[in-house]
């Protein structure tokens, strides 16, 4: 399975935590991230972050919502459940909802994923499937779309998905070619923040990289 160069990860890494401070961050940073990418024209941007807690400032939530609404590309937001802390993006026309749930096998290893989750009030596609739908006019047809599918992992240190540090994006340390026409996934890679799982090929794999693997399979 060959790595798709059109999938790029914006990494919430140790470098970004050191620069921006304690996690979770103000949603103003996410607003700045979306705004800074407007001119480079990615295909879509998906967050692997659950906004289930109160933001520090209501104005920051408002600015985040405005950045999503005014974005030139669709923004994919995961949802665990609708709360008073995340309802600001349920009412945003440019938001595509998704789920980021993953269930390990009994031995703790992530080998498979359900592309459509019907455990909500609505059917929610996985982040990876929603990203595919957002960027392919033909959609995705499969008899197994409601089943769990095995993940075909492709990973080694020399051929992994391109990762660009979150702080580098905020500071403009990237080229247009890094993101033009790309599908961007935003998520945690800093080991101290957790959100890591065992896979058949690694003992500790960031969940954002697993979502990228699933998108790569589709």
Regions found by a protein language model. Give the residues of each.
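Non-transmembrane functional regions of envelope-associated proteins
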Residues: 1-144, 179-218
């Amino acid at each position: 399975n060959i790595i798709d160069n059109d999938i790029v990860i914006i990494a919430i890494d140790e470098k970004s935590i050191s620069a921006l401070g304690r996690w979770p961050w103000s949603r103003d940073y996410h607003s700045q991230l979306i705004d800074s990418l407007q001119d480079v024209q990615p295909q879509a941007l998906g967050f692997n972050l659950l906004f289930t807690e109160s933001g520090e400032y209501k104005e920051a939530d408002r600015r985040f919502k405005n950045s999503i609404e005014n974005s030139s590309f669709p923004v994919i937001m995961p949802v665990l459940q609708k709360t008073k802390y995340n309802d600001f993006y349920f009412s945003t026309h440019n938001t595509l909802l998704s789920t980021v749930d993953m269930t390990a096998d009994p031995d703790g290893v992530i080998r498979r994923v359900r592309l459509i989750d019907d455990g909500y009030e609505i059917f929610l596609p996985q982040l990876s499937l929603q990203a595919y739908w957002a960027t392919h006019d033909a959609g995705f047809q499969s008899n197994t779309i409601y089943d769990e599918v095995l993940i075909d992992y492709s990973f080694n240190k020399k051929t992994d998905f391109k990762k660009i540090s979150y702080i580098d994006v905020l500071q403009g340390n990237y080229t247009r070619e890094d993101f033009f026409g790309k599908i961007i996934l935003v998520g945690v890679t800093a080991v101290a923040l957790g959100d890591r799982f065992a896979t058949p090929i690694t003992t500790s794999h960031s969940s954002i990289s697993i979502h990228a693997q699933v998108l790569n399979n589709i």
